[in-house]
Amino acid sequence: CLMIFLAVTLGFFAESLREHLADKKKEKQIIFALKKDLEKDTVRLYHLINMYIPEYHSWIDSSHNEIDSLPLKGNERRICKALFNSTYWEIYTPPVIAESILKDPSTFNLIKNEQVKTAILNYNADINDYTRYSEFLAGLQHSIDTSFVTLVNRQDARKLLDGLTIQNYFLEDSDIPKSIQFKTYDKAAFKIYLNRLDQIDFKIHDILGFYKIISEADIQLLKLFNDQYRLEK
């Protein structure tokens, strides 16, 4: 009977050990996948913080300068380029793997390191704060997009969008139709549009703050992963 008891007990411990090792392997795989996702995220945020947003603000300034200082007639292409680039939105999307891990409790609970779990939950709180604000901003951006056709006819606006699809960044002079005309040459209409762009400009500045917070959280999480799991490149 003793031998049977010992055999059963050893079998139980062996099975428990196998499950433990399997769970540890899964945990490390989850963290490694998340690490790769966050590394891509830091690159994306670096671009938004240091390249896109400064250039976006410069196009808002250009729109003001050109509408304030130039006659509308004869400067359609130059003004249109500045205005359209002031409505080019690069939208940040949070890391996919991070969101999927948090939405699946069975996956999240495979992470046994409490320090790491707490850090991921804090990271998720930062992402949620950004998401709520970005949803509000998206509504303003949509209203700006739809009002652009009050200044430029739909056909020309479509050509500009086609150029944006090719460029996938701010438009160049060559992307602006040579025959472009405004639907109105009343500067007051353009001033109203500029006021709406200014609202977006202020909100983009707020979004920059969220980007910096998330970027710093990315960096801190990556450091923590490397410290706790000794992950290889």
Model regions and ranges:
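Long, hydrophobic alpha-helical segments that serve as membrane-spanning/inserting helices
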Residues: S16-K233
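Membrane-embedded hydrophobic alpha-helical segments
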Residues: C1-L21
